[in-house]
Amino acid sequence: MRKHRIVSLVAALLVLLALAAVSSTRSTQKESVADNAGMLAGGIKDVPANENDLQLQELARFAVNEHNQKANALLGFEKLVKAKTQVVAGTMYYLTIEVKDGEVKKLYEAKVWEKPWENFKQLQEFKPVEEGASA
């Protein structure tokens, strides 16, 4: 009778350990998915240290040049202030750009869609940053 209780107790402990292991694995998987959420298609994420990124600089200059052609404007590229990316069919870049309009510095927001494997780049939007908005 006593052996039966010990065997039952050991079996119960093994079941509890197995359940704890499964629960821990699921929790770790959920955390891993949450950690990678910014990498999923559709999520917009900040790009750090973008002032020195040559690709982003080139995209910002492209945005200003495209706007100048479409709007018959003469804005001069000054610097890239901020950048974000979103994975779509390619990459959508959300750029905050400082330009010079004559002698006045202004901030603009640009959206540039790029699909490098197709040699495709398109300015989707170019608009002034609203007064009081943070860059």
Curated annotation (Swiss-Prot):
InterPro entries: Cystatin (IPR027214), Cystatin_dom (IPR000010), Cystatin_sf (IPR046350), Prot_inh_cystat_CS (IPR018073). The keyword Signal applies. CDD domains: CY. The keyword Signal applies. It comes from the Eukaryota. Pfam families: SQAPI. The record marks 42 as: Reactive site. This is Cystatin-1. The gene is RAMDAZC7.
